[in-house]
Design a protein with these regions (language model features):
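N-terminal Rossmann-like dinucleotide-binding module
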Residues: 1-49
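C-terminal helix-rich "cap/oligomerization" subdomain common to oxidoreductases
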Residues: 1-4, 9, 29, 69-71, ...
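Active-site loop of classical SDR/Rossmann-like NAD(P)-dependent oxidoreductases
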Residues: 37, 281-294
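Short, conserved SAM-binding/catalytic segment
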Residues: 44-51, 108-113
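Conserved SAM-binding strand-loop segment of SAM-dependent methyltransferases
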Residues: 51-58
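Beta-strand-loop-alpha-helix segment that lines the small-molecule cofactor/substrate pocket
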Residues: 69, 75-76, 80-127
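Predominantly a Rossmann-like dinucleotide-binding segment in NAD(P)-dependent oxidoreductases
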Residues: 126-200, 205-209
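Contiguous beta-strand/loop segments that form the cofactor/metal-binding neighborhood of enzyme cores
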Residues: 184-260, 294-304, 337
């Protein structure tokens, strides 16, 4: 096992509790420092979650050479700006999804990787969990036959109006917060099958508080020759993070592909033979965030720079821009050129 990382949090955020605080308790990595706009908030956060101390502002955190990894869990619109600043300081970064606000901004960040001593990974934690790996194995094995269709949902009840996920200037919207998971998951499956993912059409329901922000998006795509239905909503009646892959001989389904630790079932249904058969596999309750942190730690310690993962992140960002254009919604504004 590689040596534990000393991790600094850029932002005392809710998502950091899952991605770093709880995950590091499983992995043994060190919760070293927190920086927030309000030092008192950082101090309270550090005390509550067992961090060694705080830094007086974001700049001081990214300048700290004792840190091995900076985690950026700020609002979407700040991801690219602070990833660039951390890379320019020679830090390695785990940045929450989405990597940037739009494709131009993504490329501005990626260009910094060529000269930085550090690297940047986008926090699509679901892709590290064995449940997702097992779904891909079932599809590739031919057990459900030829690929016939995919249905993926990323739906949740509406957050309060004050939530930054509703802010256009902070790159909010259903696709940025939720739909990016669906697009990234489709690309991951497409890579495993050697098939491209193509957007066919998209339509959006705007948020009532700001018509520039998408509350719900419905999109049709194609993975190879198979049709894909995608639904992403921050105004749903409940939670639905399901991924269903249908073939000529059956289907396989993850009820919660984004957080399999909350529902680790992989359901495989066969329609061949006499009657339908169903098998439920249990993929374990370990956190996808812990799997992600172990992978990033190994990459940091081995100085591994994955062009493949960066490429998938870029294709995800390109699809996000394309969905907005196709649905008639404005592209999220960026802070970089």
């Amino acid at each position: 096992m590689s040596d534990p990382l000393r991790i600094g949090l850029l932002g005392a955020s809710r998502i950091a509790e899952l991605a770093i605080t709880e995950a590091s308790r499983e992995t043994g990595d060190v919760r070293a420092a927190v920086a927030a706009r309000d030092p008192e908030r950082a101090r309270a956060y550090a005390a509550e979650h067992g961090y060694e101390g705080i830094r007086d502002g974001y700049e001081e955190l990214i300048a700290d050479d004792t840190l091995d990894l900076i985690y950026i869990g700020l609002p979407n619109g700040l991801h690219a700006e602070w990833t660039v600043r951390a890379l320019d300081a020679g830090r390695s970064v785990l940045v929450e999804k989405p990597f940037a606000s739009n494709l131009l901004e993504f490329d501005a960040v990626a260009s910094r990787l060529e000269s930085s001593r550090g690297w940047a990974w986008e926090a699509f934690h679901y892709a590290d969990h064995p449940a997702v790996h097992r779904l891909i194995e079932v599809v590739r094995s031919g057990e459900i036959g030829e690929l016939r269709g995919i249905d993926v949902h990323m739906d949740m009840p509406a957050p309060p109006a004050s939530d930054p996920r509703w802010s256009f200037d902070l790159a909010g919207g259903a696709m940025m917060d939720l739909g990016c998971y669906a697009l990234n998951g489709l690309l991951l499956l497409g890579e495993a099958l050697g098939e491209p993912v193509e957007l066919i059409s998209a339509e959006a329901d705007p948020y009532e508080g700001d018509g520039r922000v998408d509350a719900t998006v419905r999109a049709r795509l194609r993975l190879g020759e198979a049709p894909v239905a995608m639904h992403a909503s921050m105004a749903g009646p409940g939670w639905d993070f399901g991924l269903r892959v249908t073939g000529s001989l059956g289907e396989t389904y993850l009820p919660n592909f984004v957080k399999p630790q909350e529902d680790g079932r992989l359901i495989v249904r066969s329609t061949s033979g006499v009657g339908a058969e169903e098998r439920v596999e249990r993929t374990g309750g370990a956190s996808s965030y812990a799997y992600q942190l172990r992978r990033v730690r190994d990459a940091v310690r081995a100085d591994q720079r994955s062009a493949a993962l960066l490429g998938r992140s870029r294709r995800t960002m390109a699809l996000l821009d394309a969905v907005y254009a196709e649905s008639g919604m404005p592209r999220r504004p960026g802070r970089l050129g």
